[in-house]
């Protein structure tokens, strides 16, 4: 690590701790040349996922897009932001664990819906109505019937 003051590469770690919110290791360092203290973060390097959209175009995976969609579908619902972060993290890691470099937007939506259904069913219907592009009330009702059947099976 280069010192930000003198550019020396000689430094020692004086403190190290886990930075949960960043999924990283935070290290406090001291330059052995000039004595300046500075902070570095160590992150896991992950490969980029490419999303293949419905129209065939490709773009880099964006967890912010997933999170924004979840926030919109959960507006005025009793869902904590941390729950949405957790869903987003789980979806990202599930996709990476599958080992593909490209993933369809359809697969991403399915992962999100599977997790969101267990957090808040109204938010699930909101998300599904946009994701599945419901054309009429019948499609919406069919989705809700699926939730009701799932509830009856889990209650039995």
From Swiss-Prot:
Zinc finger motifs (unnamed), residue ranges: 3-34
Pfam family, one: ATP-cone
Family annotation (InterPro entries): ATP-cone_dom, NrdR-like_N, RNR_NrdR-like
Every ATP-cone domain range: 49-139
Keyword Heme: no
PROSITE patterns: ATP_CONE
UniProt key word Transcription regulation: yes
Cofactor note text: Binds 1 zinc ion.
Biological process according to GO: negative regulation of DNA-templated transcription
NCBIfam families attached to this UniProt entry: transcriptional regulator NrdR (TIGR00244)
Function: Negatively regulates transcription of bacterial ribonucleotide reductase nrd genes and operons by binding to NrdR-boxes.
Family membership: Belongs to the NrdR family.
HAMAP family reported in the protein's UniProt record: NrdR
Name by which UniProt lists this protein: Transcriptional repressor NrdR
């Amino acid at each position: 690590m280069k010192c930000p003051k003198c550019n020396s590469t000689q430094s020692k770690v004086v403190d190290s701790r886990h930075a949960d919110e960043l999924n990283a290791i935070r290290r406090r360092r001291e330059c052995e040349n000039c004595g300046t203290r500075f902070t570095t973060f160590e992150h896991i390097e992950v490969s980029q996922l490419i999303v293949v959209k419905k129209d065939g175009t490709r773009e880099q995976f964006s967890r912010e897009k997933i999170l924004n969609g979840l926030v919109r579908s959960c507006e005025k619902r009793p869902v904590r932001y941390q729950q949405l972060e957790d869903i987003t993290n789980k979806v990202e890691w599930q996709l990476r664990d599958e080992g593909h470099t490209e993933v369809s937007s359809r697969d991403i939506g399915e992962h999100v819906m599977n997790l969101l259904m267990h957090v808040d069913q109204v938010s699930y219907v909101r998300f599904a109505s946009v994701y599945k592009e419901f054309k009429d009330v019948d499609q919406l009702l069919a989705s809700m019937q699926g939730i009701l059947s799932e509830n009856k099976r889990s209650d039995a």
